[in-house]
Amino acid sequence: MTPNHDDDKSLPLSESVTAKDILDAAERIADGIYRSPCPPSIPLSELTGCDIFCKLDLLQRTGSFKERGARNALLLLDKSQKKRGVVAASAGNHALGLAYHGKLLKIPVTVVMPRFAPLVKVATCRRLGANVLLYGETFEEAWQRAIEIASRDGLRLIHGFDDAEIIAGQGTAAVEILEDVPDANAIVVPTGGAGLLAGVAVAAKAQRPDIKIIAVEAAAAASFTASLAAGKPVNAPVRPTLADGLAVGRVGDRSFALAAPRVDRVLTVDEQALSLAVLRLLELEKTSCEGAGAAALAALMGEAGQELKGRKVVLLLCGGNIDPTVLHRVIDHGLALDGRLWRFTATVSDRPGGMAKLTQVIADAGASVLEINHDRAFSGPEVFSTTVEVTVETADQDHIQSLHERLREADFEVISATGSR
């Protein structure tokens, strides 16, 4: 691949990255990229009904597949570009990949990160030596700022998902997947700006035209879906999402041109599905995945799982950089969705034994009390009753219903409840 396919105006965008480019990139970056495993998953296969393999690209040194494209792009710079350095806009993982490999290759890196970027990614990027600027409420605003810096300082601007070098680097994941699982029926790819999707689709379809490529977007940022409907890249609204790495309002022109004719299906997943997928990966695979990385499993736990039942499916777990505070909230949210946490408000007697009676009913039902808060002052007109808010650990939704019935039978009025259906 030439250092920049943009220079070859004769190439249509749909052919601007080839399978040979990706194979060349795989050889070029091999000594600096971890060749991540793609093992079978018995628990996820049982969960989905598919024969599941997990491409663990979250095991890269900076926690995501983005290192592949970053290293490829940096290695293809000329000497003067390497000396001056590069600039990029990123919500986190592209920035981390550039910062890490820039440090290894002694190339200065500046990254503009939107203000919603996870704190753990911002801190790690700075620790790796990059010059980090927080700017803008959206990726697009951060990108415009990066363009200004590139023009002002003479830096090479490296797009996180639309440069040919980046796409070729990301496609090396598919080369490894088909080496490890040559008879895979489908690869499920988390999709934001579509650089990973484009690279995987080009590489996989060149080797196995029959393989299914399934793109998965967050419903809160479904720019590829909108672009397919329009027949060209278009802007799409972006709402806050657990899959912050997929929060892109417009897919890349090159990425779209490469991916659109090669993708077999595009699915969207909501925030509840993402939360449950993060929880399932943590419990069943002992893998801490960010929202974007869990998107592939979220899709398989829904509509895609029914369509691919019994088929050999590779889930691309593309990132593991989740902020610990976010992970804590996601676990609690996922447990509540699962019926394993239940919070209810009830009225109890404010006389000796009232609280003991409530906790005994809960214990007899086989539930565990995690937290109790009671409020005497603002519990209403009854002097000898009080409102309590109780959080309990339960087994599932049926267990919640059973506990609810026991509370009613014991004359406890459940005023409100969350975590039950």
Language model features with spans:
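PLP-dependent amino-acid enzyme catalytic core
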Residues: M1-R421
